[in-house]
Curated annotation (Swiss-Prot):
Cofactor(s) listed: [4Fe-4S] cluster
InterPro entries found in the cross-reference section: Elp3/MiaA/NifB-like_rSAM, Methylthiotransferase, Methylthiotransferase_CS, Methylthiotransferase_N, Methylthiotransferase_N_sf, MoaA_NifB_PqqE_Fe-S-bd_CS, rSAM, rSAM_horseshoe
Gene3D superfamilies the UniProt entry points to: Methylthiotransferase, N-terminal domain, tm_1862 like domain
Assembly description: Monomer.
Record: residues binding [4Fe-4S] cluster 2: C148, C152, C155
Name the record gives this protein: tRNA-2-methylthio-N(6)-dimethylallyladenosine synthase
Amino acid sequence: MERNRYFVWTVGCQMNVSDSERLESALQGVGYTPAEQAEDADFIVLNSCSVRANAEEKIIGKITDIQRIKRERPDTKIVLWGCMVGPNNQSIFKKKLPMVDHFVSPSAVDEVLALAPNPIYQLDEPALPVADWQVPPVNVHVPINYGCNMSCAYCVIPLRRGKERSRPMEEIAEEVRRICARGAKEITLLGQIVDSYGHDLPGRPDLADLLEYLHETPGLVRLRFLTSHPAFMSEKLLHTIARLPKVMPDINLPIQAGDDQLLKVMKRGYTVAKYTKLIERIREIIPNVSLSTDIIVGHPGETREMFERTLEMVENIRFDKVHIAAYSSRPGTKAADMELDPALAVEHGEKQYRRIALERLQERIATERNEECLGHEVEVLVEEFTKGKWRGRDRNNKLVFFEADGDWYGKVVNIHVTETRPWWLGGNLIGETLAIGA
């Protein structure tokens, strides 16, 4: 078997994907080549997620699948990386998963890289979060802060990723410059709570300052960011989004529930009225904004009446997208302790009922909102050609499909919308747009 081949398998959020892509870039920089399957690799990395139980189950299943490789080739190195690996559970995992050689905490790319046997080269410069530059990606995700200082009752992330740590502005800017110089057009800034960026840095720069700092990067066409928390969505940030043409009017602002009592139990730090007032202010400052949110159904203590108030809230605000999850218990969290009380636990069937009811409501709302685009022109950054059509995203992050001859990859085009569905738009190509920064 060819030596110095790696296999990276990733589950979880976009932060995990970005970490894995950065690791792959670094491994290639020290002389490794990617393997299409774990059986062909001598260095195997599993980047894990612990936000939901099914994500952990996927990783355990994958480890079970590859333990045969370890039996056949004992010198193969296997690394479990990511949010499953906390400061207090490594000894447990070592007993439970003896086929794994190393356990590494989230985002520690350099630590994983140091475990790769027999590197051929040394890295000349920090690796970029892109696994393959043969065809430059249109959109690249760049983490700007790690960890979380909040203490939401249901969330295990602070226990696994630790306290917030912001990257210096110049470090981020240099990375963005290098990425755009290689051909990327759109940068999405990532953070567990991205709008709390900078509070731990000298001078306390914030996300608005960072957006301003990155805005004139040569080659940069679009800037996005996710995920935000209502507590840090400042007037300064909103006015910056409205003023800077490369910053897309697209905000993900999780509310998690539409009942004040449940929000207090979740330790979210706001009421429905306060959140709704913020939404109204966002729409006042950025009239063309697209708004998405996250909602958990079946959280311990959520009654049917509380859920009905969540439906009412969604109907009133009319989000463009709602990411819906049935509550999943996470060991070590306040909510997991609550679920031990049968009076507070929500049965599986009831969770699914609530999830489906909310999905149906949001599908209707998304259908109605997208129908408002019919007959209008939208500006689309083209990301790929798939199934005979070009696909991209408009400024509001809506998927847009169109048919056209020629090569439109990475170009910004105007599309006349002739067709809508709940989750995408379709239309006819008008022509290329002279995008700012292109």
